[in-house]
Swiss-Prot record:
It comes from Candida tropicalis. The gene is PACTB. Coiled coil: none annotated. Its main location: other. One of its GO terms (cellular component) is mitochondrion. Multimeric. Its EC number is 2.3.1.9. One of its GO terms (molecular function) is acetyl-CoA C-acetyltransferase activity. NCBIfam families: AcCoA-C-Actrans. Pathway: Metabolic intermediate biosynthesis; (R)-mevalonate biosynthesis; (R)-mevalonate from acetyl-CoA: step 1/3. This is Acetyl-CoA acetyltransferase IB. A motif (Microbody targeting signal) lies at residues 401-403. The active site is at 91 (acyl-thioester intermediate), 353 (proton acceptor), 383 (proton acceptor). Pfam families: Thiolase_C, Thiolase_N. It comes from the Eukaryota.
Length: 403
C-alpha cells in the first residue's frame, strides 16, 4: 500500500538550557510556543488560521496547567479553532507527536499540522502526596516530580541509570567505552557549534533583564560549553558504587527546551507553493521488558527502515537519543550502525535531554545533518521509559530548500 506523502516544510528549536540555567525562567508553554512561532515564521505562506491542529509532547505535566499543547498553540498565536493534543510517551513524546501528525495528514483529517515537544525540567515541582488527606503524624515526605514521573522505572522502582548499568553489563560496555563515547559526543557538538551547524535550527531566546539589567540573548546549547575531559574521566559513578560505569557526565542531563516542525500534505504543498525540506518516509515503534528500554530502539529503528522500504545500509545518517552513552553504543551495535554515521553533530550527552522535546529535537538535527552533510535518507530513534521506543525515517528531497 502506497501512503500519501507527508512533507516537513519547516523546523525550529530553542537552544537547550541547563537545569536551573539560562532558560529556567521560561515555562513549558513559553519554550514550546517559541519553537512553534519560529518554525511558522520560516513559512510565511502558512497563515495561523491555515493550521489545522497541533500535536505536542510533554512529560512532566504537574503544575503546567490544563491542556499543555493548547497553551503552546494559543501562546504561539494560533487561532482558538486549533485542535490541540498533548502526548506523553516519556522521552519519545516529541517523536510520537510527529508520527501522529503525519498519520492524521495521511488519513485526510488534516492538511497542516504543527508537531513537536517541550520540557521545562527546571520548573517541575516537588509533590507532597500526604497533604491531600492530611499528614496526621510524623514527617511529610516531598516527592521529586522529575524523578517520579520522568526518571523512575515504576515496575522495578529503580532509576533509569540503574537500567543503563544493566545494559552496559549485558552488552559488555566498560566505563572507558562510555566515557570515550561521551567525549566524542561533546567534541562533535563543539565542532558543529563552532562551524555554525546549528544556526539554521536554533531560534535564539531573549531573556528579559530585570531591575535595570539588560536583556540576555541565548543562542547556543548551554551544556556544550561545560565540557571538561579530565573531569569527565574522573567523575564518580552515580547508580552503582561498586564496579559502576555510568556517571553524570557520560549520561544526558536535566534540561529545558522546545522543538517544532511543520508538516503538510502534498495538496497544501502545491497549493501554497512550499518547498519541502524532507518527506516522512516511514516510522516504527516497539517495546520490550520495561527495564530493558535502553535497547528498544534496536527493535524500532529496523521497523521504521523497513516501513520506508529501505535497508539499514542505505540510510546515510542516524540520530539516536543519547539518554546514556551506553544507549548509543548498544543500539548502534545491535542495529549495525557505523559510528561515523551516528549523531554526527553530537547528541544528548553533550547537548542535553529535555524529556518531551528530545524526540522532536533529534529529527530537527537529523534534517540539519542531511542538508549540510549531503545525505538523502536519515533515521532517528529514541527509547522511552516503560520499555518502548519510537523511530522515524525521513528523506531529503529538495536540495534548494532552506532550513
Amino acid at each position: 500500500m502506497t501512503l500519501p506523502p507527508v512533507y516537513i516544510v519547516s523546523t525550529a528549536r530553542t537552544p537547550i538550557g541547563s537545569f536551573q540555567g539560562s532558560l529556567s525562567s521560561l515555562t513549558y508553554s513559553d519554550l514550546g510556543a517559541h519553537a512553534v512561532k519560529a518554525a511558522l515564521a520560516k513559512v510565511p505562506q502558512i497563515k495561523p488560521q491555515d493550521v489545522d491542529e497541533i500535536v505536542f509532547g510533554g512529560v512532566l505535566q504537574a503544575n503546567v496547567g490544563q491542556a499543555p499543547a493548547r497553551q503552546v498553540a494559543l501562546k504561539a498565536g494560533l487561532p482558538d479553532s486549533i485542535i490541540a493534543s498533548t502526548i506523553n510517551k516519556v522521552c519519545a513524546s516529541g517523536m510520537k507527536a510527529v508520527i501522529i501528525g503525519a498519520q492524521n495528514i495521511i488519513c485526510g483529517t488534516s492538511d497542516i499540522v504543527v508537531v513537536g515537544g517541550a520540557e521545562s525540567m527546571s520548573n517541575t515541582p516537588y509533590y507532597l502526596p500526604s497533604a491531600r488527606s492530611g499528614a496526621r503524624y510524623g514527617d511529610a515526605v516531598m516527592v521529586d516530580g522529575v524523578q517520579k514521573d520522568g526518571l523512575l522505572d515504576v515496575y522495578e522502582e529503580k532509576l533509569m541509570g540503574v537500567a543503563a548499568e544493566k545494559c552496559a553489563k549485558d552488552h559488555g560496555f566498560s566505563r572507558e567505552d562510555q566515557d570515550n563515547f561521551a567525549i566524542n559526543s561533546y567534541k562533535k557538538a563543539g565542532k558543529a557549534l563552532s562551524e555554525g551547524k546549528f544556526k539554521s535550527e536554533i531560534a535564539p531566546v531573549t531573556i528579559k533583564g530585570f531591575r535595570g539589567k539588560p536583556d540576555t540573548v541565548i543562542e547556543n546549547d548551554e551544556e556544550i560549553g561545560k565540557f571538561n575531559e579530565d573531569r569527565l574521566k574522573s567523575a564518580r559513578t552515580v547508580f552503582q558504587k561498586e564496579n559502576g560505569t555510568v556517571t553524570a557526565p557520560n549520561a544526558s542531563k536535566l534540561n529545558d527546551g522546545g522543538a517544532a516542525l511543520v508538516l503538510v500534505s502534498e495538496a497544501k504543498l502545491k497549493q501554497l507553493g512550499l518547498k519541502p525540506l524532507a518527506k516522512i518516509s516511514g516510522w516504527g515503534e516497539a517495546a520490550r521488558t520495561p527495564f530493558d528500554f535502553t535497547i528498544a530502539p534496536a527493535l524500532a529503528v529496523p521497523k521504521a527502515v523497513k516501513h520506508a522500504g529501505l535497508t539499514v545500509d542505505r540510510v546515510d545518517f542516524f540520530e539516536l537519543n543519547e539518554a546514556f552513552s551506553v544507549v548509543g553504543l548498544a543500539n548502534a551495535e545491535l542495529v549495525k550502525i557505523p559510528l561515523e554515521k551516528l549523531n554526527v553533530y553530537g547528541g544528548a550527552v553533550a547537548m542535553g535531554h529535555p524529556l518531551g522535546c528530545s524526540g522532536a529535537r533529534i529529527i530537527v538535527t537529523l534534517l540539519s545533518v542531511l542538508t549540510q552533510e549531503g545525505g538523502r535518507f536519515g533515521a532517528a530513534g529514541v527509547c522511552n521509559g516503560g520499555g518502548g521506543a519510537s523511530a522515524i525515517v525521513i528523506e531529503k528531497i529538495d536540495s534548494d530548500a532552506k532550513l
